[in-house]
Amino acid sequence: MYYLNKMLEYNKENGIIINKYIRKTIQKQIRIHNKYIYRYDRVTQAIEWIEDNFYLTTGNLMKIELLPTQRWWYELMLGYDMIDEKGVQVNLINEIFLNLGRGSGKSSLMATRVLNWMILGGQYGGESLVIAYDNTQARHVFDQVRNQTEASDTLRVYNENKIFKSTKQGLEFTSFKTTFKKQTNDTLRAQGGNSSLNIFDEVHTYGEDITESVNKGSRQKQDNWQSIYITSGGLKRDGLYDKLVERFKSEEEFYNDRSFGLLYMLENHEQVKDKKNWTMALPLIGSVPKWSGVIEEYELAQGDPALQNKFLAFNMGLPMQDTAYYFTPQDTKLTDFNLSVFNKNRTYVGIDLSLIGDLTAVSFVCELEGKTYSHTLTFSVRSQYEQLDTEQQELWTEFVDRGELILLDTEYINVNDLIPHINDFRTKTGCRLRKIGYDPARYEILKGLIERYFFDKDGDNQRAIRQGFSMNDYIKLLKSKLAENKLIHNQKVMQWALNNTAVKIGQSGDYMYTKKLEKDKIDPTVALTMALEMAVSDEV
């Protein structure tokens, strides 16, 4: 346990806090250490070889120096042997789960593991795989390995002499016929393999569990095999990531001598408020990633629930939902203004039409002296209002009494019933209707209204606005303008809709509107966002 003790000394000197999950792993190692063959020699050989031959391939080109924590990880991966049922001495540890905050060099570390296995693993004709959600992610780790063949003096000589070479299938170390290949997360393709080292990258992106398909082939055909699951945590629930977290936290897994879990994460959400606790999720912070970068992300997330979710998931290792309420009470506050701001002013319209079930909203915005003003006509049918529960009906009644929600005495929303109200707003304010944005799925229903107010032969005054993640830029712009008090509204129904509005966070960090509860109506928010997009488009 030489490297465990060195890591503990390092943590004490640098104020790094160990969470309860890592403490459990340490207890497990102590138990295992007393039962099995300790391979200090193999671990030290791997560490020295890596530090002698490997380079950082981004930023300054310099040799890698593994931190005490990373050396300990190598001790867990390579430090113990057992005697199997055939009487053969084999590597004890088959599975490692590394849950580690974003920017901590997971892919670079895995590149060293792959090359150490290919060249020093002593296995003739073996195969190593990097498995990822898609080909782009798989290439990330694959390219880290390939870059070392150009950066490292030793590997470059191997490369130049065709000892280490690229093939159509991947990379090959010809002396031992060991290969390294990339593969996407496809259960059918994984059947029947016989790989010895498997790197499952960013497992929080996986829906179905491919691990058993890969591990089955390794387990049946290889004496020495190892699968390493790496992730920065994520927002996809009920997939492989959640299964792994649950498994590696369990008592059953604690007594499985052939695996180690490295769950670097906060123990609860409240701990994020004290920066000292961040070392629970980012044990290498200060080296990778930089303190300043993580602090900047934390500060940027203040006042933005969606960014806070992402920070807790990707930086602090906590399983978070991919949906979060988006606007804060400060964002949605009412500011009184007079509708005269629309008088003779270019006015942009967004319309979100729902025939029945949700609300229909027609939002008007105009610009004046650096601020955007909005007013929204919101509609429903009386039969829907009458079916509400008491609490919701009282809320809607307030909107009706304020003149902000218009109830129509029809079975469903008829576009022709909206026209008198639009006419009334135009007459009352003297606004100049300029452009309209609408959901293309509703065009045939809205066509008459659009042509009535926004006809032009080139169609420049009309825009079909794709819904979903395509609205990302304008969703974020609306948030920004509300937070800076540069978008002004004075309607309770709009405040309610904004407070109802959640965003779903995509894999690339894009947002799309959604709602958490059926009773949460967000149609005025959607209409306002489309109107804002039209206003911005007229400035470009």
From Swiss-Prot:
Mn(2+) 1 binds at residues 352, 424. Its cofactor is Mn(2+); Mg(2+). The keyword Coiled coil does not apply. Signal peptide: none annotated. It comes from the Viruses. Mn(2+) 2 binds at residues 352, 523. The keyword Magnesium applies. Interacts with the terminase small subunit; the active complex is probably heterooligomeric. This is Terminase large subunit. It comes from Lactococcus phage p2 (Lactococcus lactis bacteriophage p2).
